[in-house]
Every structure is written in C-alpha cells, then in structure tokens.
Amino acid sequence: MSMRYGGYRAVLQWALLLSLWLASGFALAQPVSTAQASANPQAGNRTVLVVGDSLSAAYGIAAHEGWVALTGQRLAARVPAWNLVNASISGETSAGGAARIVSEVVRVKPAVVVIELGANDGLRGLPLRDLRRNLARMVGASQSVGAKVLVIGMRLPPNYGQAYTDEFERGFCGIAQLLHASCLPFLLEPIARDRTAFQDDNLHPVASAQPALRDHVWPALLPLLD
C-alpha cells in the first residue's frame, strides 16, 4: 500500500473528485443488486467471483461495458477454462459483503474471489477496525472453500485527515498480506487524475475508461488462474 499515484497535484485532483462525489449525495448509498455472469458458464470450468460495489457493478453504463464484464470477455478469449460471475452490488459496504460472502461462495463455488469493497466505508467515515474485520471475514470465507483471493483497494482524499486516510489505505493490502491473499492497492489508479474518465456525477467511471481498469486488474488476477 506504499504505492503513490502522483504528486501533490494528483492528490488535489482526486480530492476534488471525491468531494464532488460526497456533495452529490454519494450514489452508492442506495444498494442495487447487479449479480450476473459475464460469460455463459461451462460445465467443468473454474469460476472467478467478483464481490464489489458500484465501481464493479457497471453503475451508469451498460453491464457489458464494465471492467468486470470486460475481464470476463478476456477470460473467455484467453483462458477459456474459466468463467466469471459478477456479484457486485451498488451501495455495498464491507459489512454487506461480509454478511453475504458465505452464501455467495457456496452458490458459485469459485476458485478465485476478487473483493472490491471498502470505498463506502471510508467515505462515510466508518470505523476502520470494522473494515479490516469485514475484509478478513470475506477473505477467510473465500479461502475456506479453497479459493484464491485478490483484494482491490481504494484511497481517500486528504481532507479525511492524514491518520485516517493512511490507515484506510494500509488496511486492504495489510489484511491481504496477513491472510496470504493477493492485493491491488488502488482500482482507479490509471484514471484517477482524469476528470473526463468519470460520469457527470464525478464518481463513476465512464464506459470508455473501463478498459483501463480491466487492464489494471488483469496482471494481478492472471497469476491466480493457474
């Protein structure tokens, strides 16, 4: 989690985006289920399960345009022995994910689980010990069925206070390292400094930005597909 995505100017740009995010009422606050398969499951194939919030649920764009669906398409083309199931829910917090993770892994029986949750926790200023506990529960439940896990993190603007933002950022890869899971520190790394990459709500990436997110996640996911 020590990686940085730019200098002071980049921090200000990201802070502006998230300030507008909060000012808009934070659209992720209304949970909407978007569970879907990104490819037609094939008998005998192994499955990647994605559990996330609206950043993974293709909020505001067609489902097939989101980075998760694009990853499913790439799997079908390059690693056809794998399926992808997207169980992301707009508005989800880590507590919501932790509450449903057992039923999801029992239902899907994944070989790999991608966890992209925590943004809502941080933007609402929720206790970070709860975020860490919920992440640990999700990782543990996934590993209990034999799945490998990729945790995808987020970052917060500096106006939340240095101590809170630093602890928030460290939590994702900290839990992953503790539980021997993989970690990608920041989902929005390749687009965070580009306001044109976001929808009018200044919060959700546009369709044209989704391939960059897929390409960012892919190198972290690929080693788990052995």
Q: Language model features by range: what are they?
A:
Residues 2-15:
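Bacterial N-terminal signal peptides that target proteins for export
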Residues 6, 74, 80, 98-226:
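Alpha-helical cap/lid subdomain in secreted, periplasmic
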Residues 11-12, 18, 33, 62, ...:
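N-terminal non-cleavable signal-anchor helices
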Residues 30-90, 100-109:
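Serine-esterase "nucleophile elbow" of acetyl-processing enzymes
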Residues 91-95:
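Acidic-and-aromatic substrate-binding clefts and catalytic sites of carbohydrate-active enzymes
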